[in-house]
Curated annotation (Swiss-Prot):
Subunit structure: Homodimer.
Annotated residues for binding of heme b 2: R67, H83, H156, K224
Organism annotation: Bos taurus (Bovine)
GO CC, any one term: lysosomal membrane
Note on how the cofactor is bound: Binds 2 heme b groups non-covalently.
Enzyme Commission number(s) of this protein: 7.2.1.3
Enzyme superclass (EC): translocase
Name of the protein described by the UniProt record: Lysosomal membrane ascorbate-dependent ferrireductase CYB561A3
Function of the protein: Transmembrane reductase that uses ascorbate as an electron donor in the cytoplasm and transfers electrons across membranes to reduce iron cations Fe(3+) into Fe(2+) in the lumen of the late endosome and lysosome. Reduced iron can then be extruded from the late endosome and lysosome to the cytoplasm by divalent metal-specific transporters. It is therefore most probably involved in endosomal and lysosomal cellular iron homeostasis.
GO biological process, one term: intracellular iron ion homeostasis
């Protein structure tokens, strides 16, 4: 049952994440003319798409790598490398998104970093950069001791969830700000809820629901990878491998691995 709920949640996340990206693309194409890379308003339209894709969807996918049951066994290095690579890709898309909005502001002679949305966003990106550097240097490179990693892991996990929360707040405030700037004239003010406002509000709600589901999976203790030190505290259950060799499975892993064992038998 546990593994079923986990993969059902992953399927829901994939659907919600895709919808968040597609809704943002459609909003920028249908109501704001599409995309370009020339310093115009069409270049700005890349900003929400890249930020939602990088800071929310890809960032969340990278954060959930260690929740996959397949990552609980075998060497950790491939999973660590995948985790770091996905976060790096998310960061690169985020930097492109920032470049798009800064270039548009330069072209249109608009001041930088004056709104609450921009303060939230730049703080989130700064924390993301620090988080990635800390994770790469301490948890991926081999120099750090187990004591140091154990000390920094709770901090790394806390800021991982905090950065996602800040990213969601930045996206929601950015959607709100964009609508206030776009819907100015008397025929389609934001308060009258024209079709663009309804659509963009729905896109924002999708981002919020997506983020809450990601945070739930990250915080659910039954879906976390068991710590190596917990093996001695849990009663091991012996099963038979495919070739008849004994395998040791922790009690906390049995629920997620049960379907695999049934297939083997």
């Amino acid at each position: 049952m546990a593994v079923g709920w986990f993969y059902l949640s992953v399927l829901a996340l994939c659907s919600l994440g895709s919808m968040c990206i597609l809704f943002t693309i459609y909003w920028m194409r249908y109501w704001h003319g599409g995309f370009a890379w020339d310093g115009s308003m069409l270049m700005f339209n890349w900003h929400p798409v890249l930020m939602v894709t990088g800071m929310v969807v890809l960032y969340s996918a990278a954060s959930l790598v260690y929740r996959l049951p397949q990552s609980w066994v075998g060497p950790r290095l491939p999973w660590k490398s995948g985790h770091a690579a996905m976060h790096l890709l998310a960061f690169l898309l985020t930097v492109l998104g920032l470049h798009a909005v800064f270039e548009f502001h330069n072209h249109a002679k608009i001041p930088h970093l004056y709104s609450l949305h921009s303060w939230l966003g730049i703080t989130t990106v700064f924390l993301f950069a620090c988080q990635w550097f800390l994770g790469f240097s301490v948890f991926l490179l081999p120099w750090a001791s187990m004591w140091l990693r154990s000390l920094l892991k709770p901090i790394h996990v806390f800021f991982g969830a905090s950065i996602l929360s800040l990213a969601i707040a930045s996206v929601v405030s950015g959607i709100n700000e964009k609508l206030f700037f776009s819907l100015k004239n008397g025929t389609k003010t934001y308060s009258n809820l024209p079709s663009e406002a309804v659509f963009a509000n729905c896109a924002g709600m999708l981002v919020v629901v997506f983020g809450l589901l990601v945070l739930y999976i990250l915080l659910a203790s039954s879906w976390k990878r068991p710590e190596p030190g917990m093996q001695a505290e849990r009663e091991p259950t012996r099963t038979r491998g495919r070739a008849g060799t004994p395998e040791v499975m922790l009690e906390g892993e049995r629920g997620l691995a049960e379907p695999l064992l049934q297939k083997r038998s």
